[in-house]
Amino acid sequence: MVNQLEMLYEGKAKKIYATDKEDMVIVHYKDDATAFNGEKKAQIESKGVLNNEITSLIFEMLNKEGIKTHFVEKLNDRDQLCKKVEIVPLEVIVRNVAAGSMAKRLGLEEGYELKTTVFELSYKDDSLGDPLINDYHAVGIGATTFEELNKIYEITAKVNEILKEAFKKQNINLIDFKLEFGRYKGEILLADEISPDTCRFWDAKTGEKMDKDRFRRDMGNVINGYREVLNRLRN
């Protein structure tokens, strides 16, 4: 049993709390929804509960598959116990199908099947709008090393294969998603969350969107999309 202490950090969708175990934190999932680098904001009732449950199920699955993550256990509807990592200030964006900003940037039709999975890298800095960078930028600015980045890409590729297969069984196409990583006792761990906030999930038969695009694009029924992902994951 761990006890929650002071809040260490508050982000757009989560709060991080210290605990009486030095190497553990409590991650609390909020109902806040944001898009376009915080320009669009709303409260969506139960979003935090659903994202906590979805992320917990996915991290449990990845842990069983040998992927090392920061996730320890789900504590309650909104809280997880996680290892206290030093976050690598990068996001790895995995694109299996062209959608969103990539489709717009490259003049591709949404839904275009990419000839190979594309990894993109962004520098985590809200004031800069999380700009896309390349491997040399990432190493050059001191965010990582080539050795660490190779390890991150290796884990990312494995996670993509595991998740694509798992969601395919539930008639969900994993279009794209973002991952974050942290350093913990000399190792690189998968961190943050994997949820409809961080992934694009399309129904394999209808193409219906079941993710944060419903909020970004004012499509309505945001929470129903999240709930549908959870219901299928539980099967």
From Swiss-Prot:
Annotated InterPro entries: SAICAR_synt/ADE2_N, SAICAR_synt_PurC, SAICAR_synth, SAICAR_synthetase, SAICAR_synthetase_CS
EC number: 6.3.2.6
Pathway: Purine metabolism; IMP biosynthesis via de novo pathway; 5-amino-1-(5-phospho-D-ribosyl)imidazole-4-carboxamide from 5-amino-1-(5-phospho-D-ribosyl)imidazole-4-carboxylate: step 1/2
Catalysed reaction equations from the record: 5-amino-1-(5-phospho-D-ribosyl)imidazole-4-carboxylate + L-aspartate + ATP = (2S)-2-[5-amino-1-(5-phospho-beta-D-ribosyl)imidazole-4-carboxamido]succinate + ADP + phosphate + 2 H(+)
Keywords: ATP-binding, Ligase, Nucleotide-binding, Purine biosynthesis
Gene Ontology biological process: 'de novo' IMP biosynthetic process; cobalamin biosynthetic process
Entry GO MF terms: ATP binding; phosphoribosylaminoimidazolesuccinocarboxamide synthase activity
One Pfam family of this chain: SAICAR_synt
Domain of life: Bacteria
PANTHER family hit by this protein: MULTIFUNCTIONAL PROTEIN ADE2, SI:DKEY-6E2.2
Similarity annotation: Belongs to the SAICAR synthetase family.
Name of this protein: Phosphoribosylaminoimidazole-succinocarboxamide synthase
Species assigned in the record: Clostridium perfringens (strain SM101 / Type A)
